[in-house]
Structures are given as C-alpha cells and as structure tokens.
From Swiss-Prot:
Main enzyme class: lyase
Obligatory cofactor(s): Zn(2+)
Family to which the UniProt record says this protein belongs: Belongs to the alpha-carbonic anhydrase family.
Protein name (database record): Carbonic anhydrase 6
Domain of life: Eukaryota
Biological source species: Canis lupus familiaris
Domain Alpha-carbonic anhydrase, chain residue ranges per copy: 21-278
Any Gene Ontology CC annotation: extracellular space
InterPro entries: CA_dom, CA_dom_sf, Carbonic_anhydrase_a-class, Carbonic_anhydrase_a-class_CS
Subcellular location: Secreted
Glycosylation sites: N256
Signal peptide positions on this chain: 1-17
Gene name tied to this protein: CA6
Length: 320
C-alpha cells in the first residue's frame, strides 16, 4: 500500500522539483497572488474565473443546448485522487460534449472547488452578480480534433469546461453523490487514490442542462492557459448540509491541513463578452440583495456548524 501511495505521489513530487515549490491558493511564496512569477500566463488578460454580471450578458439566439453523450451510467472503474489541490475523478473518452458550433469535446476529468473556512463558507470560482455559491463542479474536456489531452492543452482551441454551481439549503441528501462522498475518507492525504465503481455524471449535474453562460477564458489553476471555452450552467446542483460539510472537511492539502477554500479569486473581464442561450432574468445584483445574500450565507454557515456539532456529539452504540 505504501509503495502504491508513493507511486501515485511521484507526479506531485515532480511538480515540486520543477517549480521549486508547490503552488497554493492562500499560503506560502507561491500563493495565487504570486502564480504569475512562475506561471506567466496566470497574469494574462483572458483569465478565469469571472463574475457573471447578468445585466451585461448578451443573449445569443443562435446558441443551442449542449449535446451531452455518454454521461448516463458509465459502467467500470473510475480512479479518484486527492492531488493536494482538489478531488479529481478520471473520466472515460466515451463521454462527449458537443457545443453549438459543432465542436465536439472529449471528457478528461472532473474536479471540485469549495469553501469551508470559518471566515468564508462559499467556495465557487465563478460568481453571479457578485454572489459566490457554496461549491463548483468542473468537467474538463479537450477538443476531439486532437489525439489527446496532452496535445490539446497547448492548442488555442484545445479545451472546454462544463461548470455547475452548487447550492445548499434545506435539501435532503442528494443520493447521486453518496457514492462519491463515501469514498472521500479513502483519499485523505495528497497522492492517495481510490476507485469508484460505476458513475452517472448526468445525474450529478442539474436536472436542466439546457441553459448556460459561455465565454472564452483560462484554466483556473497553473499554468492558467488561455484556451478554455467555458460553459457555466444556469441551474444548480443541490447538496445537503452534511454532504457539503463532508466535501469541505474530508481531505488534507500538501501542508497536512484540511483543504479549505480551493478556489481562485475573480479575474478581470478585460472587455470579453459573456453570452447566454437564454433571455436573462432581472439582475439580483443590487447592493441590498448582495447583503441579503451575504447574511443568508452567514446564517447557513451557523446552521451547518450546528449540524456538525450534532453529528460529533451523536452517541455511539456499542453492541455486546
């Protein structure tokens, strides 16, 4: 088991050797503010994530719904790893996404961004009218015109990411996430991996995947290459408070600390156009609504903290 863990950790050790120190989100010499020092593209003009300001989004009636194939019930084994920055699941090439312009993209992997720190409970990367959601799911694809992800990641039209924002309110358990969340304890430390048996990505997404925002941007982690066609779904994934707490508190980072707030800060739009394939609803970005949402976030944090306390204090029944 130790030999396997060491083998899986070799790419992480290689990254440390190549760049001097591992990049982080908020600590050390290579936190996200200083990424451009060793990854110059991270200081580019077409970076992600961005704030999706609905009153500025341009409706494009020619944009059609995304065509997702192979997302429904995949049989087999799917490696899941703690890479020190997030939880990442490898996906089969039978999963495809076709954009409105006819470009077909092949799924490579999916990963998650979340909050969890006491001062900031929300951890989505994209925001809507300045409002940050609890978490965000990214399904990374590469352009099928290229033979592999390794080739496509260096090409100007190489990548596409399908993103879904996560809400948590008084929802019951989302059973489509039960298998995934139950495996988090198996990858507590960076480099550890486990295997998911069977995966239904379609059910892990919002029920409605027809409406989206789209723009041209970058990867949100180093090397921040500016070759990503982003599709951010309008409708949300719903998780229970307990599921969200487990996502936020189950794995450790490279500093042996609980991995919290693994999201990049909002980047300037720099004149880019954000389009949608639906007519926007009236904006909720007023100052009043902003503070209402902020208060709701704080109340949600306190509620989840109470739920956590209840779980920890739940008596254990010992059988004779």
């Amino acid at each position: 088991m130790r030999a396997l863990a060491l083998l899986l950790a070799l790419p992480l050790l290689g990254a440390r050797a190549q760049h001097g120190s591992l990049w982080t989100y908020s600590e050390g010499a290579l936190d996200q503010v200083h990424w451009p020092r060793e990854y110059p593209t991270c200081g580019g003009t077409r970076q992600s994530p961005i704030d999706l300001q609905r009153r500025k989004v341009q409706y494009n009636p020619s944009l059609k719904a995304l065509k997702l194939t192979g997302y429904r019930i995949q049989v087999g084994e799917f490696p899941m790893i703690n890479n020190g920055h997030t939880v990442q699941i490898s996906l089969p090439p039978t999963m495809r996404m076709m954009a409105s312009d006819g470009t077909e993209y092949i799924a490579q992997q999916m990963h998650f961004h979340w909050g969890g720190a006491s001062s900031e409970i929300s951890g989505s990367e994209h925001t809507i009218d300045g409002i940050r959601f609890v978490a965000e799911i990214h399904i990374v694809h590469y352009n099928s015109k290229y033979k592999s992800y390794d080739i496509a990641q260096h090409e100007p039209d190489g990548l596409a990411v399908l993103a879904a924002l996560v809400k948590v309110e008084d929802y019951g358990e989302n059973t489509y996430y039960s298998n995934f969340i139950s495996h988090l304890n198996n990858i507590r430390y960076p480099g550890q991996s486990t295997v998911l048996s069977g995966l239904d990505i379609e059910d892990m997404l919002p029920e409605n995947t027809h409406h989206y925002y789209t723009y041209r941007g970058s990867l949100t982690t180093p090397p921040c290459t500016e070759n990503v066609h982003w599709f951010v779904l309008v409708h949300h994934v719903r998780l229970s408070s307990i599921q969200t707490w487990k996502l936020e508190n189950s794995i450790l980072d490279h500093q042996n600390k609980t991995l919290h707030s693994d999201y990049r800060r909002i980047q300037p739009l720099n004149g880019r156009v954000v389009e949608s394939n639906f007519v926007n609803l009236p904006s909720q970005g007023s100052e009043f609504q902003f503070y209402v949402n902020k208060l709701n976030n704080k109340l949600e944090y306190l509620r989840r903290l109470l739920e956590k306390t209840k779980v920890e204090k739940k008596p254990h029944i010992h059988q004779a």
